[in-house]
Design a protein with these regions (language model features):
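A broad, structural surface signal
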Residues: 55, 250, 416, 474-475, ...
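Extracellular polysaccharide-degrading/modifying enzymes targeting complex plant/algal/animal polysaccharides
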Residues: 26, 30-348, 354, 361, ...
Length: 717
């Protein structure tokens, strides 16, 4: 017994020593909004800013090479400039750094101002007040932006498909809810009736900057607008995948004719249900809670508050709230990023940075931008530009035009357990890896909830934009957006265990997951995902292999009410669909030979595909080794879709198995189609796991169960 007691005593002492050593291996620096500038940074004597905490951390590294944690106490930390954690600003990355909130407290990094209640006043200019509708006139309040300390009130700009991304204009948030620039109609759009002049069309090379002219009908509402030349219109003016926004020039309210100051990217059209517009930036249209208008001349904000008005915030900072560059081994945890006109976090050339359990909301751009963007030469054009830090700009078009561009996203960076919502231009933009060597970036987005991420720009501003090589998106719930959930470029990406739903709600000819137009971008795997409730009134897809896309394996996914077409293959090859479940969708798949007809120009000699293939040396290692069929692309009749097989899939209540010619998408005999419940655990309530007695096990020998319970966002203990 004495021997046992002695051993236990020694063990306890060892444990105490280890715990003590562990505790001493971390230096803690505390921050509190009401702390002191010259404080020591202890829990009882905290500093008052993150910047000061970083200064203390930098001084401690040479003396005590231990891990450092900066702990933020509850409160709001206002940022008038970007907070920098960079090699140039002094962080050496010699020790791991963690920045986190204290226990369960809420630490907010804020890029704007919280407006004091006494600054919210009744409208004093009665002549101006007469512009408001009589029924709401007494409810509208005004804020002097000078009194609120807002120096830069911003300005509206063109935005939309193939236009550069840029910081938003001044925005107001009431009770955490984004305000809306006063618009009409409050919901929906007004059809374009007839097009008198489509205007110049920048997309097809016309740079004359001529506005368009079209007619509307059925309303006299514009006759109320005193200064229509200050108003803007937005909508899908030509194609249902291309939103746009342009300033008005004038309105003939008698003839119901609208003329715009500048051109729409694709010009104006009519005759399609999405070809419509709504007008905004109109003080006369403040008629619902949250609507606002900024008078640039008087620097006054007018808005209609809700009945339960609490906190009022105004965004101001146009640069990122936080920038990390040339640094390693940094962890951000339980932080709250909000109220910036630009992006939440910008990262460049980072390694091992982890962003965990953070919230990003009410931002004018995206939450996280992992890499270097492209500063546009012209804010209205998507052409050209210069790679630039801490910006987004023309990055989407630039990557399209320069498909091997390394935008310096770093490697081994991860975004986990975060929530992103109410952002203006998407969620997470992530690169990493080398498209010439196929070296993986190993960057990842895991277990995040990303929703309502297109407040301002509607198309091709996805929940996750993933480029480069060897990056992955897993266990994310991505939902409630007018267009794309995941937009891909590059090679060897893994998309798994995601719940993608209520996407493509407004757009036409778009997919919840989209990639295409580059046959060298291969090696992708899409598995164990749940695509459901995709699309609105127009043609949409769950997985969109656009314009000759090749080399994506799609297996063990569930597609339920997954748009018009669950898997849309636009002329490509080597896109097998295996062991998937398709339920209550018009077409399980689509196949066409567009590279033989309307899209054949991409195969021209010295054309787009030849340029993109030769850029990566497609017929030499490593491409010829990883993708052996690609090495013979030109000898293998590239205009004909091939090797797009459909095997071991379950189709339940599908109106037609495929849209297109069967020889291009062979349905093998091991698929099973039925119009009745095949033995789901609970068909009616959406539990599409197969019961042990399901007929599928016999109908499709070798069919493997899809682990529905592992799909989507997983709550952590």
């Amino acid at each position: 017994m004495r021997t046992i007691a002695f051993k236990l005593t020694v063990l306890c002492l060892l444990l105490i020593t280890c715990v003590s050593a562990g505790a001493q291996s971390v230096i803690s620096i505390y921050v509190r909004p009401d702390g002191k500038t010259d404080a020591a940074g202890s829990i009882k004597d905290p500093v008052n800013s993150l910047l000061q905490a970083l200064v203390i951390a930098e001084t401690k590294v040479p003396k005590q090479p231990k891990s450092i944690e900066i702990i933020l106490r509850e409160g709001t930390y206002f940022l008038s400039n970007t907070l920098e954690i960079t090699k140039n600003s002094g962080w050496t990355s010699k020790v791991p750094l963690t920045i986190k909130a204290y226990k369960n407290e809420k630490a907010v990094l804020h890029g704007g101002k919280i407006i004091k209640p006494e600054l919210l006043k009744q409208v004093t200019d009665q002549q101006y007040a007469s512009r408001f509708l009589p029924e709401v006139r007494n409810k509208i309040r005004q804020i002097s932006l000078d009194d609120a300390g807002i120096a830069n009130i911003g300005k509206l700009r063109t935005f939309g498909f193939s236009r550069p991304m840029a910081p938003a204009w001044l925005e107001i948030f009431v009770n955490g809810t984004p305000g809306i620039l006063a618009r009409w109609p409050n919901h929906g759009t007004v059809p374009i009736v007839n097009v008198i002049d489509t205007g110049s069309i920048p997309r097809w090379g016309d740079k004359s900057n001529r506005g368009g002219t079209f007619t509307y009908a059925g309303t006299n509402r514009p006759s109320r607008w005193k200064n229509p030349e200050k108003a803007w219109i937005s909508g899908y003016f030509m194609w249902g995948y291309a939103d746009d926004a342009v300033q008005l020039n004038k309105i003939d309210t008698a003839e119901k004719i609208i003329n715009t100051k500048g051109p729409a990217h694709y010009g104006f059209g009519n005759g399609k249900p999405w070809r419509a517009w709504y007008a905004y930036n109109l003080p006369e249209e403040i008629d619902t809670a949250g609507e606002y208008y900024v008078d640039q001349d008087t620097r006054t904000l007018y808005f209609m508050p809700p009945d339960n008005m609490g906190k009022v915030e105004i965004s101001e900072l146009e640069t990122p709230l936080l920038a990390m560059e040339d640094v390693n081994d940094i962890t951000l945890k339980n932080l709250y990023f909000t109220c910036g006109r630009g992006m939440g976090i910008s990262m460049e050339r980072t390694n091992g940075v982890k962003i965990n359990a953070c919230t990003f909301t009410n931002l004018g751009m995206m939450a996280i931008f992992m890499g270097k963007g492209v500063k546009p030469d012209d804010l209205s054009s998507n052409e050209g530009g210069t790679p630039t830090s801490r910006t987004a700009g023309n990055i989407v078009q630039y990557m399209y035009d320069h498909s091997t561009y390394d935008w310096e996203s770093g490697k081994n960076n991860g975004i986990t357990d975060c929530e992103i919502y109410n952002t203006g231009t998407g969620g997470i933009y992530m690169g990493g890896g080398n498209r010439l060597t196929l070296e993986a970036g190993n960057n990842f987005v895991e277990n995040c909830r990303i929703h309502d991420f297109n407040r301002l720009e509607k198309t091709y501003r996805p929940g996750v934009w993933v480029t480069g090589v060897g990056n992955h998106v897993s266990n994310c719930e991505i939902y409630n957006a007018p267009s794309v959930g995941i937009f891909m470029h590059g090679n060897n990406h893994l998309i798994e265990y995601n719940n993608l739903h209520h996407l493509d709600l407004d757009a036409d000819d778009m997919g919840a997951l989209y990639f295409g137009r580059n046959p060298s971008e291969q090696g992708h795997i899409v598995r164990y995902n749940y695509f459901h409730h995709i699309g609105g009134q127009h043609k949409t897809m769950a997985v969109y292999h656009d314009d000759g896309a090749c080399g994506m394996q799609v297996y063990k996914n569930v597609f339920y009410k997954a748009g018009t077409v669950a898997g849309f293959i636009g002329g490509g090859r080597d896109n097998p669909y295996t062991n998937n479940i398709f339920i209550d969708t018009k077409f399980a798949a689509h196949i066409d030979d567009r590279l033989k007809n309307w899209a054949r120009a991409v195969l021209d000699k010295d054309g787009l595909f030849q340029q993109r293939l030769e850029l990566v040396n497609y017929n030499k290692p490593p491409y010829s080794v990883q993708y052996p069929m690609l090495a013979k692309y030109w000898e293998d009749d590239p205009a004909t879709p091939k090797r797009n097989t459909f095997s071991k899939n379950l189709l339940v209540n599908i109106k037609q198995r495929a849209e297109g010619h069967a020889e291009w998408l062979p349905f093998l005999a091991d698929n099973y189609e039925t119009n009745t419940d095949p033995g789901f655990v609970d068909y009616e309530n959406g539990d599409f796991r197969l019961s042990k007695t399901s007929e599928v096990w016999k109908k499709i020998p070798g069919f493997e169960a899809i682990p529905m319970e592992k799909i989507g966002y997983q709550k952590r203990p």
